[in-house]
């Protein structure tokens, strides 16, 4: 299809008062280039450098200096005939988006003055190389990429040129595309603000013409679900009503899993796979919400967020640079039943990546400034959840299934009250009491041998103190004797969220796996499930 780049003759600013929004959001969009255009690679580097990480000009200005938002994202999105370079940020409550826009252009001026170094460029390209191989790590990924190259580049073999283009970007390219597509160029600005807070939108914005569906009670269309839908079928060269015969059962080659338990009690499980030069790992430390005080829910979530914000000997920015320079990613997060440290790295850098994991795990920095930022970000997320139907449903459903007094009935992030009551000492207490190798499992898959894995864990095994962790005895969950219907009203909601369920099997139950297969076929398998087919088809 013929390329049709967008040309703006003026900057356009529009706003919209959202009935359900809790926080103001600003989007800035510049016309850019289509997928696989020679400039798209430098634009992706530019977006990453400007917005991602502690060193990013946008992060430094909007998050750290001006404290207008918890995060800011920027990305280059290329399609078949055109593309867009987009910035998005959700500001804190009652923040004037004019101040946010002003801070954005202040950050861009900083970039104009300082540019991008070879070191930072190498760091970003290392991450992009890892992402490239990640996209090829499954059969689905390979098929999707080859199809995408055929459609957008006209040749599936472009896969080989794509990675070369990623690695060929220079600092001069990044400056050039900034000057060509961003600096002094017209853009589209959209301000989405809570109802009756139009003053938070950018000045000189016009009201967007958004047609809202009117919800009229009792006006729903009536239909008989027993009547099969009729529709005109697409012509076919063969009779699709005749089901083809089943072929032979596939010969599934289950990968070999090796196991080892280290002297500290740390359990290790691994699969060696050399198809792509990557290693992925996950360290699961049992606990999470299970070990929290009901009056201070959110401790494990905040702790996980703080673990990757520097170490004893590395500032947050230094740690981030060390990770990204390896083409790696290391994330920490909490779940209802664990605190998890996961990672993804080039195989050649696996040992160096695990050395950083050891620092993160055993030498936390405990920086008050970072704790305050994470706390503020969490409070902002909790506020946003109030406008998210799925979050509302999940929170209400957990209370009904587990009961008000069960620890798992709580939102993992906590509430405004509980998060505000948490101090950094609460995190230190959880860390010193509940983080132990004796309740930890390490899973690793990739181009790495068992001996290399155990060697990478030797320092963690030697230096991590094992302790007895006491888990609370949870009340037994009871299945309701009769079906019950609960309704949570969101006035003016445009859609409904339905949840059906009851307390069921533990993951250790012998029927758990058969039940997951049953559930997949019944309703959990997307378009392969009977429920979806009944509702959609």
Task: State each model region's role.
Residues 1-17, 25, 160-285, 443, ...:
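Proteolytic maturation boundary segments
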């Amino acid at each position: 299809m013929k390329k049709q780049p967008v040309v703006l003759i003026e900057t356009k600013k529009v706003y919209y008062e959202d009935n359900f929004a809790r926080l103001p959001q600003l989007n800035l969009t510049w016309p850019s280039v289509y997928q696989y255009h020679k400039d798209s690679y430098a634009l992706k580097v530019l977006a990453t450098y400007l917005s991602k990480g502690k060193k990013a000009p946008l992060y430094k200005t909007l998050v750290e200096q001006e404290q207008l938002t918890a995060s800011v994202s920027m990305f280059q999105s290329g399609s078949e005939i055109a593309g867009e370079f987009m910035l998005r940020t959700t500001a804190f409550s009652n923040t004037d988006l004019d101040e946010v826009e002003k801070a954005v252009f202040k950050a861009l001026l900083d970039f104009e003055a300082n540019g991008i170094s070879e070191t930072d460029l190498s760091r970003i390209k290392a991450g992009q190389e890892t992402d490239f191989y990640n996209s090829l790590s499954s059969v689905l990924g390979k098929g999707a990429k080859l199809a995408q190259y055929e459609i957008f580049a006209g040749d599936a073999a472009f896969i080989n040129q794509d990675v070369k283009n990623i690695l060929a970007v220079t600092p001069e390219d990044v400056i050039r595309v900034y000057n060509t597509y961003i600096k002094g160029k017209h853009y589209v600005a959209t301000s989405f603000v809570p109802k009756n807070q139009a003053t938070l939108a950018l000045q000189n914005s016009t009201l967007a013409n958004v047609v809202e569906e009117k919800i009229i009670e009792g006006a729903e269309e009536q239909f008989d679900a027993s009547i099969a839908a009729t529709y005109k079928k697409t012509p076919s060269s063969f009779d699709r009503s005749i089901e083809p015969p089943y072929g032979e059962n596939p010969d599934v080659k289950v990968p070999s899993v090796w196991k080892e338990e280290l002297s500290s009690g740390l359990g290790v499980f691994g699969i060696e796979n050399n198809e792509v030069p990557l290693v992925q790992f996950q360290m699961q430390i049992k606990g999470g919400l299970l070990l929290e005080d009901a009056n201070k829910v959110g401790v494990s979530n905040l702790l996980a967020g703080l673990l990757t914000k520097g170490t004893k000997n590395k500032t947050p920015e230094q740690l981030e640079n060390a990770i990204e320079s390896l083409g790696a990613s290391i994330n920490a997060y909490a779940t209802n039943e664990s605190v998890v440290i996961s990672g993804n790295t080039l195989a050649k850098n696996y040992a160096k990546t695990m050395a950083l994991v050891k620092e993160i795990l055993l030498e936390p920095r405990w920086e008050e400034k970072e704790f305050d930022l994470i706390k503020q970000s969490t409070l902002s997320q909790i506020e946003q959840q109030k406008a998210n139907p799925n979050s509302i449903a999940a929170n209400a459903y957990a209370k009904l299934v587990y009961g008000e007094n069960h620890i798992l009935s709580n939102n993992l992030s906590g509430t405004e009250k509980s998060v505000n009551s948490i101090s950094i000492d609460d995190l230190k207490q959880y860390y010193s009491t509940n983080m132990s190798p004796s309740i930890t499992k390490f899973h690793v898959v990739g181009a790495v041998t068992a001996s290399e894995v155990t060697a990478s864990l030797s320092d963690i095994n030697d230096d991590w103190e094992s302790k007895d962790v006491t888990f609370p005895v949870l009340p037994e969950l009871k299945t309701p004797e009769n079906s019950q219907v609960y309704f949570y009203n969101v006035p003016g909601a445009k859609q409904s969220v339905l949840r059906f369920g009851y307390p069921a099997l533990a993951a250790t139950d012998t029927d758990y796996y058969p039940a997951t297969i049953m559930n997949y076929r019944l309703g959990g398998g997307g378009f392969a499930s009977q429920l979806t087919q009944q509702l959609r088809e």
